[in-house]
Every structure is written in structure tokens, then in C-alpha cells.
Amino acid sequence: MIAIGLEGSANKLGVGIMLHPKDGSTPQVLANIRHTYVSPPGEGFLPKDTARHHRSWVVSLVKKALKEARISVDDVDCICYTKGPGMGAPLQSVAVAARTLSLLWGKELVGVNHCVGHIEMGRLITGASNPVVLYVSGGNTQVIAYSSQRYRIFGETLDIAVGNCLDRFARTLHISNDPAPGYNIEQLAKKGKQLVDLPYTVKGMDCSMSGILAAIDALAATYGLNGEQPDEEEDVTDVTPVSDGALESRKPTRADLCFSLQETVFSMLVEITERAMAHVGSKEVLIVGGVGCNERLQEMMGIMARDRGGSVHATDERFCIDNGIMIAQAGMLAYKTGFRTPLKESTCTQRFRTDDVFVQWRD
């Protein structure tokens, strides 16, 4: 059985084709095509511009995916699309494309929860059996565990997502959005040597990111680091003595601020993930979502998991970052249980909770 998946909840448009062999063997990725809308440095991506990008590219990506998979339209069993959550206009553009293909090809539709898509793709690629899931992206920050045919949310951000926090600080520093602002923050953070004190906000199983962003934005403004910088290395030579005879402390660089932001927010994520592991008795962590590609986050989570006698599972950028193949995978799992999305119900929603989905394909 073959599913084609369309993903476009944010600035990445993905088309994936997944084969589920009839003998029940491991599913195979036949195609995983993606194109990203990149906004200018210092700017985020607006819904209308992102939707225009998706409309412009979706036909060519579908054709390319079919060619790469070496299949014809007749081989496709169902068309899966991201129903939500995400940005309204981009979601609508993908839903329209899915409905159009359904009518043209005479194939059934399957609306997929974006978050569940990440989880199921992560489970397939890594082989994680029943992990605590840390789902971290530009729009979501959740700690999840499976129970009674639902992916239960044990903790989440109380305001903005961790990826949103990193992306917005990249805008403050006027860092390039190519290939992604969060990735460029990560690379800059590797050069950081000074840990700047930032708010640390964990409330039980939940966390908050907006205060940290406000604090580090203020620091960047105080030290004149917001906006374009001619040369990052120039900042390192500015050394300012601390009062009352303490050790010398230099003016922080942009790299120091990126390093400090990552260390702080990732420490918070490790804490709430560990608390969930203790609660459900799991020794596995699965990190999914775009921020899950961050090597420092994986390293910090790995240290915690090993201390508990456990392990961390993560995927590379092919499957961690938004993609169509994860929608095809989750959609096919639902399709095989008999789930269908009638044409008149093939809408999309910006608010679609992970625990709203009845996970019929798991025990």
C-alpha cells in the first residue's frame, strides 16, 4: 500500500511517498521532497507569503516525488495531508492541493495531525518502542507519552515554543534565515565561551520562554549586538573588569548570547523531560521536531538519559524537520485501520492538539 503525504503547516513544503508492504515488513521511504520558503534576514515568514510559496511549488514537488518514487498515480492508495496545527494560510493551501489531487486521481483523503506525524516518523526511523517524546519545533514544545490510545501531553510551553524563541532571537541579531535561523543560532553558539545569566522558568511540568526572550533581547540591545554586525570576532577583544576585584568578565559577544540562550532553554527541556520519564517509568527519550536536530540538545538529553540508565533517540534533518513523509507514514497507519477524511470534512485547523487524536493503530 502506498500513501502520498503533503506537509505545509509552516515555511516548509514537503511531499513524501511511503510504501507499506502487504507482508507487514518495515515500511519504505520512496520519496521525501522538500522546499523551504526563506525570508530575508531580520524578518519572519508571513502566512500570506508562505502560502503563496506553497501554491507555487506544490505541483512541481508532487511530480518530482512521483518520479523519484518510480510510481504512477494508479499505484497510490491514499492522499494524506496536514490538517493542523500550524499557520492558517499555508495549511489551507496544502488542504486545497490535497483535495484537488483527490478529485483528479479518485483517491481517498486522510487528514493528519502534524505532531502525531512527527512522533510516528520518529518511532519508525529510530525503532524507539514506547519513549517519552520531546516535541520541539517553531510552533510547539510538548513532553508527551503514550497511554490508552492517546499521545498524552505531560508538559508544554505556557507561551511561545522553543523554536519560536530561537528564531525570534535570530531576528534580533539579524542572523540569516538560510537554511534556518535556529540552525544558524546553533552554529554561532558553538563559538560562545561566556554563560550569561538568564531567567530559568519551569512550572512543574511546564515551561515558559517569553521572559527569557525578552531578557536576552534587552541584553543584546544593551551591548549593541542587535541588528547587523560587521564581524563577530571583533567583539571578543572587549574585556571589562568586574567590580570589587572579581575575575575579569568581558562584554558578551553574539556567540555568547546564543550559547547562553541554548544552555538555558535546553536545561529547562531536559528537566521537564526527566520528570516525565520518572512519572511513566520510561528509560527512552525520543526527540522530534525541527529543534530536535540541534546537537547540543541531543547531547544534554543524552547525559540525563544515561544517568538514568536510559537512551535518547533522534533523527537527522531529513526526518526531524517538517516533511511530507511523516504525514504519509501517520496517514497510512490511520488509513489501514479504516480511517478516512470525507471531502466535505477535509478542512484544516490551526489548533489541533496532539491528544485529540485517537491512536487506533497502537495497542
Curated annotation (Swiss-Prot):
Cofactor note (record): Binds 1 divalent metal cation per subunit.
Positions annotated to bind a divalent metal cation: H114, H118, Y135, D322
Compartments, as annotated in UniProt: Cytoplasm; Nucleus
Superkingdom, taxonomy of origin: Eukaryota
GO molecular function, one term: N(6)-L-threonylcarbamoyladenine synthase activity
Matching InterPro entries: ATPase_NBD (IPR043129), Gcp-like_dom (IPR000905), KAE1/TsaD (IPR017861), Kae1_archaea_euk (IPR034680)
Gene3D superfamilies in the record: 3.30.420.40
Binding site for substrate: Y135, V136, S137, G138, G139, D167, G182, E186, N294
Major enzyme class: transferase
EC number: 2.3.1.234
Keywords: Activator, Acyltransferase, Cytoplasm, Metal-binding, Nucleus, Transcription, Transcription regulation, Transferase, tRNA processing
An individual GO BP term: positive regulation of transcription by RNA polymerase II
Catalysis: reaction(s): L-threonylcarbamoyladenylate + adenosine(37) in tRNA = N(6)-L-threonylcarbamoyladenosine(37) in tRNA + AMP + H(+)
GO CC annotation terms, alphabetical: chromatin; cytoplasm; EKC/KEOPS complex; nucleus
Requisite cofactors: a divalent metal cation
Described purpose of this protein according to its UniProt entry: Component of the EKC/KEOPS complex that is required for the formation of a threonylcarbamoyl group on adenosine at position 37 (t(6)A37) in tRNAs that read codons beginning with adenine. The complex is probably involved in the transfer of the threonylcarbamoyl moiety of threonylcarbamoyl-AMP (TC-AMP) to the N6 group of A37. Kae1 likely plays a direct catalytic role in this reaction, but requires other protein(s) of the complex to fulfill this activity. The EKC/KEOPS complex also promotes both telomere uncapping and telomere elongation.
Subunit description: Component of the EKC/KEOPS complex composed of at least bud32, cgi121, gon7, kae1 and pcc1; the whole complex dimerizes.
Family recorded in the similarity comment: Belongs to the KAE1 / TsaD family.
Protein name: tRNA N6-adenosine threonylcarbamoyltransferase
Natural source organism: Emericella nidulans (strain FGSC A4 / ATCC 38163 / CBS 112.46 / NRRL 194 / M139) (Aspergillus nidulans)
Classification lineage: Eukaryota, Fungi, Dikarya, Ascomycota, Pezizomycotina
Encoding gene per record: kae1
